[in-house]
Amino acid sequence: MKTETGSNNNNTTVVNMDFDMYPSISGKQQDPVREVVMKYIDYFLPDASGTSAVAIDNKIEQAMDLVKSHLMIAVREEVEVLKERISELMDKINKLELENSILKSNIPQETLQQLQLQLQLAAPPATPAIQAAPAVQSVVAPAAAGQAVQQQAAGAVAVTGVATSPASAVVPTSIPNGSAENGSSAVESAAVSVEQQVQQVTSAAAAAASVVTANGPMS
């Protein structure tokens, strides 16, 4: 591999590349990577030739300038492509916004509300709202339990008052099922209880009178 032909981008001169051009520097074997770099420099920049350190540095600087220029060209091309793409997207957005405004102005209000409702239903539910619901239920549950306990206590007091009231033994507070037969039976039982109480009072009065007669009047 002694020579190879190639063409420079700046001119059409055919260059012979000597791969064994820099076998060593100051009696030491050259780095393989540096050798490859130097070969590419000789291929693309044939004007900067020589074996001195200054010539090598010049070639490296020229190679770096060449790389920078290629990178700048590539970046500019990419920027132009991105600008075109952004411009196309902006035009599309403007067109869609115009179509949306036209549709909103011509669509019935009911249909628009239905669409908004469908969008709300299709949207994922909010996680904080779901997490807050059990807390509300836990607050409502003790309140409901407290109300139930209060109602039970009030019912117990009412039942106790009915059981201890003398009038409750005479007159019933309610008539089951609202029928005439049940009403008459309740009245009859109340009358019987009244008669029994009258008899008890009469017998007690007679007993007291007999005691007074037997013992005589008190002086």
From Swiss-Prot:
Probable transcription factor required for peripheral nervous system morphogenesis, eye development and oogenesis. May be required for the transmission of the dpp signal and for a morphogenetic movement of the medulla in the brain that reorients the second optic lobe relative to the first. Plays a role in determining proper dorsal cell fates leading to the formation of the dorsal appendages. InterPro entries: TSC22/Bun, TSC22/BUN_CS. Keywords: Cytoplasm, Developmental protein, Differentiation, Nucleus, Oogenesis, Transcription, Transcription regulation. It holds the Pfam family TSC22. GO terms for biological process: chorion-containing eggshell formation; compound eye photoreceptor cell differentiation; determination of adult lifespan; dorsal appendage formation; follicle cell of egg chamber migration; intestinal stem cell homeostasis; mushroom body development; negative regulation of apoptotic process. Belongs to the TSC-22/Dip/Bun family. GO terms for cellular component: cytosol; nucleus. This is Protein bunched, class 1/class 3/D/E isoforms. The keyword Cell membrane does not apply. It comes from Drosophila melanogaster (Fruit fly). It is found in: Cytoplasm; Nucleus. GO terms for molecular function: protein homodimerization activity. Residues 82-103 are annotated as: Leucine-zipper.
